[in-house]
Amino acid sequence: MMNLAWVVPLFPLCSFALLLLFGRKWKKASAYVGIVATLLSLLAALGVLAGRLGGTTYEANWTWMQIGDVTLTAGFSVTALNAWMLVVVAFVSWLVHIYSQGYMAGDERFSTFYAYLGLFTFAMLGLVLSPNLLQAYIFWELVGLGSFLLIGFYFYKEEAKAAAKKAFIMTRIGDVGFFIGMLLLFWQTKSFDYDDIFRAVGDGTLSPGMTTLTAILIFIGAIGKSGQFPLHTWLPDAMEGPTPVSALIHAATMVAAGVYLVAALFPLYEASEAAMMTVAVIGGVTAIFAATIGLVQTDIKRVLAYSTISQLGYMMLALGSGSYVAAIFHLTTHAFFKALLFLAAGSVIHAVHTQNIEEMGGLWRRLPWTAPLFLVGALSISGVPLFAGFFSKDEILAAAWLNGSVELFWLAVAAALLTSFYMFRLFFLVFTGEARHDGDAHEAPMSMVGPMVVLGVLSVASGYIQTPWFGSFLGEWLTDGAYHHEAAPGWIAVVATIVSLVGILLAWLMYGKRTVPRDWLSARAPHGYELLRRHYYVDDFYRWTVVALVSFISRLLAYVDRYLVEGIVRLVTGTVSAAASAGSRGQNGQAQTYGAVTVAGLAILVVIFALTGGYWL
Amino acid sequence: MSGTDIAFFLLALAAIAGGVTMLQLTNVVHMVIALVMTFLGIAGLYVLLSAEFVAVVQVLIYSGAITIIMLFAIMLTRHHADDKERQTTGGVWHRAVAAISVLAFGLAVYFGIRRLDFGADGSALAADNAREIGKWLYSYYTIPFEIVSVILLVALIGAIVLAKKDGKGAEDK
Amino acid sequence: MTLSAYLALALILFCIGLYGALTKRNTVIVLICIELMLNAVNINFVAFAKYGAHPGVHGHVFALFAIAIAAAEAAVGLAALIAFYRNRKTVQVDEANSLKH
Amino acid sequence: MSFLSLLVFSPLLGIILLAFVRRTDTKTIQWLGTAATVPPLLLALFAFIRSGSGFRLEQLDESYDWVRLANLPFFTDAAYVIRYELGIDGLSLLFIVLTAVLGTLAAVASLLIKVEKKGYFMWLLALEIGMLGVFAAANFIWFFLFLEVTLVAMFLLVGKWGGFERERAAYGYLLYNGLGSALLLVVIAVLVARTGTANFALLHETLHNPVAEGQLIAPLTAEARYWLLGGLLLAFAVKLPAVPLHRWLVRVHVEAPPPVVMLHAGVLLKIATYGMIRFGIGLFPDEFRAFAGAIAVLGVINILYGALLALRQRELKHVLAYSSVSHMGVVLVGLGALNEAGIQGAVFQSVAHGLIAALSFLLVGVLANRIGTTDIHRLGGLAKAMPIFSGYLLTAALALLGLPGLAGFVGELTAFLGLFETKPALAAAGALGLIFAAVYSLRAILDITFGHTRERYESTLGLRGAKESAASVSEPRVIDLQAKEAVPAFVLVALIVAVGVYPQLLAEPLATVLETMMNGLGG
Amino acid sequence: MNDVWQANWSMMTPEWIVLAAAIVLLLIDLVMPKERSRRPLAWGAAAGAVLALIATAAMIPADPVSILHDTFRLDGFAKAFKLILLAGGALALLLVAEWEPKEGSHYRGEFAYMMLFALLGAMMTASSGDLLTLFVSIELLTVSSYVLAGLRKTATASNEAALKYVINGGIATAIMLFGMSYVFGLTGTTNLGDIARELQETNEPYMLALAFLLLLIGVSFKLATVPFHMWAPDVYEGAPVPATAFFSVVSKTAGFVLLLRLFVTIFAAAPAEGRDPSSLLLSMQPVITVLAGLTMIIGNVVALRQRSLKRLLAYSSIAHAGYLLAGFAAMSWAMIDSLWIYLLAYVFMNIGAFAIVAHIVNETGSDDLAGLAGLYRHRPLLAAALGLFLLSLAGIPGTAGFIAKFYLFIGLVVTEPGHYVLATVMAVTTVVSYVYYFNLLVQLFFRPASLAPLRRLPAGLSTAVVLCALGTLAIGWVPDLAYDVLAQFGHFGDFLP
C-alpha cells in the first residue's frame, strides 16, 4: 500500500482539474466530485497508515531535473510523521468538503470553490509526502496559492482582495527565508533530501554556524506560514475567506505546515541550541501575544484566528523545547477542535449573517447542535481536563518545564489562562444572554452539522492517543518506539487545570453573569485596551516602517529612473542634437567661411606639427 | 651684394607691395591694377631665375589676359558698385581667424624653408629654354598636355554655357 | 640669390593671396587672389627648377601647366560669377548665401 | 535545401505569397500569415523530438562557401573565408523551439491588428526569420546579419503598428540596440580580422589552442581578450537589458503592438542570454571569470531595481516592462554564478520568461482591445465580467512571481541555486526580489480583476454591453476570452506548466552543451 | 619623340572611347537643330561610358603597362578604380538623361559631355603615375564639375553652387599645388616612382611633412572630408541632382584614387621625424585618423537636422567619406581592397538613392523629405528600392553597405595596434546615421500618402534604380561577386611603380 502513497494527493488534483474544466457545467454536482476525491484520498491515506503500522518506511524518487552531475529528484517517502499527517489532513479536508456543500450552497462559483479546495488539499498532501526540501518548498508555495485563492474567493470584496494579497505576500516573505535556507543547505550537503541533510548534520559536514543559520532561515518560512510573530498579521485578515476555508486552511492544515516543517527537519534543529531557542521563544511569545489580542476582538472569526496563532505558538514552543511529539500531538488535537470551532462559527454566521459577536447572543436555543458542539470545542481548547486539548497542552507545558525554560513555561501558563478566558467570552457572548440581532436564526443543514459532530467526538477522543494514564501511543509511533514519557511533575497538570477553570470563571463573571463590568479593562487601562484592540499596532508598524521604506525606495528609484537614467540619455541625445544644430548653424552659407575653416584646420595641423617636431600623440 | 640681388629685392618688393596694396585698396579696379604690379614683378623674377619663356607667358597671360578679363568682368557686373561699400566679408572674427591662420601657416612654412638649400646653382638651365620646354611637352608630358587641351576646351564650353544669356527662343522651348 | 629667398617670397605672396581670397568681398577680387596664390606656387616651381634637387626645365613646364589651368579656372569662375550676377544682381561673395545650414 | 535553412527561411515563402494578396483581404492575410509560421514550428518540434531520442544535432550542420574576404598569398587558404553556416546544439535548439512556438502564437494573436495587416505580417515573418537565424547561425557574420534583420523588422513593427508614442519607442529601440549591435560588430570584426574565421567552433578552437595562437593573423593579447569580452557583454547588456540601459525596453513594451511584444519580450531579449553564453562563456571562459562578480551584482541590481519600479507603475504594460527588467536580472544572476546550475538557470529563466511574457502580453492585447485601457487605476473587478480572461491573467501573474509548478520558478530556482554556491550573500539579497515580485504582480493583477468594478470604466463596459442588448446596461457585459484567443493562451499556460512541472524537458538538450562549457571553464 | 609613337596607346582605349564620345556628342550638340531634344545625347554618353567600362573589363587580364614615364599607368589599381568610376559615371548619366530642369530653363546637351569630360579626368587620375598628370587630370575633373554644378543657369541656387565650388575649389587647388611644388622641389622630378626613391634620401623631413599636410588638405577638398567639407552640402544642394550624384560618387572616388596614388606611392617610404621614422605616411597616421573621426562625426551629426534630401545625402556623403578615410587611416593590408569594395557599394547605393530623389525632385519640384511621405502607398516597389538603398547606406546587413563597412572594420582592427577608437567612432556614428536614414524610412512607410501619386519612373531612372538595387543586393548577399573581381587585380601588387 505504501508504494502507492503518491495516489493520495492525486485524487484532489484530479478533482481540481476536472472541476476547472467542467465545473461550470456540473454546478451542484461539483461538490460530490470533491467529496469523493477527498474520501478516496482519506481511504488511501488510511491504507498508507496501515501499511506504516507494519513498521516499514518507503521512499521513491524520480529525476526531476539534472544540473550537470547533480540530479534533483522528485518522489515521496512514507514516514511515521507524514503517514500520520496524511490522515489528519485528508480527514479534515474531507469533512470540510462535506460541510461546504451546505455552507456554500447557492454561491454562483460553487464549483470553483471546490476546485480550489481540491488544489489546496492536493498541495497540502503533496507537502506532507515530500521526501526532500525542494519538493516540500514547491508544495509549500502551492499550499500558499490554495490559501490565497480561497481567501480571495469573494474577489469582488475589496477586503478579500486585500487579505488574499496580504496573505500571499506575508507568507512569501517567510518563504524567501525558507528558499535561502534551502539553497544554502543544498551547497553544504549537496542534496535536498531530508535523509542526506540529517546525515550531514550527524557527521559534522554541516558546520554549527551554518546549521543554526539554515535552521533559522527555514524557520522564517515556518513563521510566515504558521502565522507566528512577527509575520502573523495575515492570518486574522485571512478570515475574509469563506468559513470552511478558515477551518481547513487557517486552523487545521496549512498553518500547521510550519510546525510540520520544523518537525520534519527536527534533527537539524536539535543540532543547534540557538535554533531551538529561537523556535521556543518565538512560539512562547506568539502564544501569549496572540492570546492577549484575542481578548478584545469582536469578530467571531478573528477571535478564533488569534487563538489559532496562539495555539500554533504553543506547538512551536513544544518543538523548541525539544518535544517533537508534544507538538505533533497538539497539532492533531488542535486540528480537530479548532476545525470544530471554525465550523461551528461558520454555522453561527450562516444563521445570523454577521460575524460581529456584539450582534449575536442567545443562540443556545436557536442552534441546538452548533452550540453544544462549540462548547465542546471551547472546553477542549481551554484545556479542561478529559478533553483532548487538556492532554496536548499539558504535554507542552511539561516539555517547556522539563526543558528548563521557566520563563517560557509561565508564559505558556498565562496564555492558557487567557485562552480559556477569551474562548468563553466568545461562548457567553454568542450563545447566552439576550439575542442582539434581528431575524431568524436556523440550525444549519445536516451536511454541516454532520462534520461538526464527527469533529466534536474527535475533540474529545483524540486526546487519548497520548495520555499519562493510558500510554503514549502517538509518541511511540512517531519515534518508532524510542519514545519514553518523561515524567512531568504532577503539579503542572493541576496548574493547567486551575488556570483554565479560572479563565472560564472570569469569562462567566464578566459576560455570563455580568458581575464584573465588561468595560473593566477599557475603563481601567484605555491605552492598553486600545493597544490590544489594534493588535499591538503591528500592522501600523509595518505600514509606517517596512511598507513606507519600500515605498520610499521605489519612489526614489522611480525618480532615478525618470530623471537620472533617462536624464543621462536625454543629455547624450541632447548633446548630439545640440551639436547637430550647432554644426548646421556653422554651415552659414559663406564660401569664405568654409575656406577659413579649412585654412584654420591647415594652420592648426601645421602649427601642431611645427611645435611638436612631428611627435604626434 | 650683386646686381641680381638688388634686382631680386626690387622685384620682390614690387610684388609684395602690389599684393599688400591690393589688400588695402577699396576700389576694385585699383585692386586689379595693383595686382598687375605683382604679376609683373613675378615675371621679372622668372627672368632672374632663367625662365624667360615662363616670364613671357606670365606677362602675356597674367598681366595681360587674365587682368583684362577680370576688368571686363568688373565692368560687366558694375552696375551699382560703390567704392564706399565694405570691401571685406564677415566680421572681425572671421578676419581675425583668417589672419591668424594664414600667419601661423606662413610662419610654420617659413620655419621650414628659411634654410632650404640643395646647393644647386641652376646654371645648367639652357638659355633657350623655350626649345627645352617644347621638347618636354611633346615627349615626356604629352599626355598631360593633351589633358590640358581638354581642360581648355571644357573651360571654353563651360564659360560659354554659364555666361551666355539664354535666348528668349530657347527659353520658350 | 638663394633658394629660400624665392621660396619666402612665394610664401608671402601665397599668404597674401590666401588672406585676400578669404576676406575680400568682391568675387572678382577673390578669384584674382586665387590667381595670386597660383602665381606664388609658380615662383616655387620656377625657383626649384633652378635651385632644386634636380634642376631642370620640367619645373617650368609644371609652372606653365599651372598657368594654363589657372586661366581655365579663372574663365569658368568668371562665367559662374556672371551667371550668378545675372540672377542676383550682385557680385559680393557674402551675398551668395541662400544655401546654408 | 537543407533542414536548418528550410527551418530558418520557410517564413520567407509566406512573405512572398503575402506580397500577392490584396491589401484589403485581411482574412486571407491573417490566415496566410499564421500558416507561414507553422512550418518552422513543425520543423523545430521535429528536431526537438528527434534530439530527445538520441539524434545528434551536429548532423544538421550546413556550410557553403559564401565570401572570401582576402586572398593574399601570405594567408592560408582557410583564412578569411566566411561561409554560410548554420548549425545548432541543444542550447540553440531550445531557443529555436521557443521562437517557433511564440512566432505562431504571436501570429494568431495578431488578430487584434487592424491596420495595414499585409505589411504587418510581412515584417512579422521577417522578424521570425531573423530570430530563427540568430539562433541557428554557426558563424558570427550570419549571427549579426540575422540580428540586424530583427532590428529593422522591430523598428518598423513598433514604429508603424505601435501606440501613441510608437515612433519614439521605435527610435529608442533602434538607437539602443543599434549601439549594442555596433559594439558587437566591432568585436566581431576584431575576432574575424585577427583569427581569420567567423565560425564559432573554429574561433573556439583557435582561441583556446595554444598552438593555434601562433597562427593568428594578428595577436590577441590577454588584455585584448578582456576588452573583447567586455564589449560583447556590454553589447548584450543593452539587449538584455541590464540596468541602466533599460529605458528603451520600457517604451517598447508599452508602445509596441502586443503580439510584437510577445516576440520581443519572449525571444528578442533572449538573444542576449544566448549571446552571453555562446560567445561570452563559450569563447572567453577564462576572462569571463573576471566579469562574473560584476555580472552577478548587476543581476541583483536588475532584479531589485526592476521589481521596485514595477511596484509603482499604474500602467499594466509598465509593470510588465519593469518585471521583464527584473526577470532578465535573474539571467544575469545565473551567468554571474558561472557554474552549471547558474548557466542552466539563465537558460531556463530565458525560456520561462519568454513563455510568461508572451502570455502576459497576449492577455494585455486582449485587455486593451476589450476595455481600451490597461491603466490599473482605471480597472477593477474584471473577474466578474471576464472570468476566463481573469483566470488566465491570474495564472500569468502567478507565473511572473515565480510560483513553483510554473516555469518561472524553475528558472529562478536554478539560477539562484547557482549563485548560492559562489556568492551566497549576494544571492540572498537577490532573493528578496521574490518578495517584490509577489507584491507587484499581485497588486497589478488583483487590482484589475478583483475588487469593485471601478466607476470610471463601468461606463465603457456598459456602453459596450448596450450595443449588444440595450436592456442589459445595468449588467455590464464584455466579451470574455474567445476561443481563438484562448487557444494560444492555453498553449502557453500548458507549456508554462509543463516546464514548471518537468524541467528535465529543457535540461536534457542542454546537458552536453553545458558539459562542454564547463570543460571550457576548467571544471 | 620616339617614345610618343612607340607607346602602347591601345591601353588607353577606355579613355579614347570616353573622349571620342564626348567630342562627338559636343559636335552633335552644335549641329543639332535647336528645337530637337538633347536627351538622346545623355543616352549616348551613357553608352559611351558603358563601352569604356566593357573595354576596361576586357583589359583586366592585361599586364601592367606604363606609357611615357608613367604619365599613364595601367596597373591593377587603375583598372579596378576605372571600373567604379565608369560604372558610377554611366549610372549618373542615366540620371542626366531624365533630368528635368526647372524654373523656366531648358534641357542642356552640355550636361552629358561635360560629365564625360569630368569622367575622363577621373579616369586619368586613376591611371597616372606622374605628379603633373595627376594634377592636370584632377583639374579636368574639377573644372568640369564647376560647370556641371552651375548648369541650372536660371536657378540662383545652382549659380551659387557653382560660385562656391569655384572659390573653394580654387583655394584647394592652390593649396594642393603649393604642396606639390615642395614635393617637386625636394625631388626635382614629377614621376611618382622617382619621387618616392628620391625622398628616401631626403634630409628635409620637416618640409616633406609640410608638403604632406598641404596635399592632404588639398585632397580633402575632393574627398569632402574635414576640414574641407563645408562646401559640399551647399554645392550638392544647389547643383542639379544628376550632377550631385556624380560629385558624391565619381568625384569622391577620384579623390580617393588621388589620395592613394599620391600618398601611398610618395610618402609610404619617406623618412619622417614622427613616431615611425621610416615612413612619413605611418607617422602621419594620427592626423588622418583624427580627420577621419571628425569627418564621420560631423557628417553624421549635422545630417540629423537636414530636411532637404539632397542636403541630407550631402552630409551622408561626407560621413561616408569619413568611413573611407578611416579605412585609409588604418593602413592595413586590406586598405585598397576595402576602399574599392566600399566605393563600389557606394556607387550602387548612393546613385540608387539619388535616382529616386531625382524623381521626387522632378515630380514635386522640391527636395524636402516630406516629399517621400507615403511613397510606399503609391509606389511600393520604388519605396522598397529606396528603403534598400537607405539600409545599405546605413550599413544594415543583407546589403552591399554592410559588406563594405565590415571590410573597413576588418582593416581597422587587423593592424597592430588596432585602431579600436576609430572603429568605435565609426560604429557609433553609424548608429547616429541610423536616425536620419530611418527617418526617411519613416517618411516612406509610416507617413500618410500625399494627395497626388507620383508618375511612374522614366526609363533612365528606372534602369538606374534597377541596376543599383541589383548591385546593392548582389554585393550584400553574394559578396563573392565583388571579391572575385577584386581578386583579379592581385591585391594591387603592381600598385607601386
UniProtKB/Swiss-Prot annotation, chain C:
Q: What is its EC number?
A: 7.1.1.-
Gene Ontology biological process? ATP synthesis coupled electron transport
Keywords recorded for this protein, A-Z: Cell membrane, Membrane, NAD, Quinone, Translocase, Transmembrane, Transmembrane helix, Transport
Q: List the disulfide bonds.
A: none
Localisation per UniProt entry? Cell membrane
Q: Report a single Gene Ontology molecular function.
A: quinone binding
Mind telling me which InterPro entries this protein's record contains?
A: NADH_UbQ_OxRdtase_chain4L/K, NUOK/Mnh_C1-like
Gene3D superfamilies tied to this protein: 1.10.287.3510
**A GO CC term?**
plasma membrane
Q: How does it sit in the membrane?
A: Multi-pass membrane protein
Q: Membrane-crossing residues?
A: 2-22, 28-48, 62-82
Q: Which reaction does it catalyse?
A: a quinone + NADH + 5 H(+)(in) = a quinol + NAD(+) + 4 H(+)(out)
Q: Which family does it belong to?
A: Belongs to the complex I subunit 4L family.
Summarizing the function annotation, the protein's role is: NDH-1 shuttles electrons from NADH, via FMN and iron-sulfur (Fe-S) centers, to quinones in the respiratory chain. The immediate electron acceptor for the enzyme in this species is believed to be a menaquinone. Couples the redox reaction to proton translocation (for every two electrons transferred, four hydrogen ions are translocated across the cytoplasmic membrane), and thus conserves the redox energy in a proton gradient.
Describe the protein's quaternary organization and the partners it interacts with.
NDH-1 is composed of 14 different subunits. Subunits NuoA, H, J, K, L, M, N constitute the membrane sector of the complex.
State the name under which the record lists this protein: NADH-quinone oxidoreductase subunit K
- Which species does this protein come from? Geobacillus thermodenitrificans (strain NG80-2)
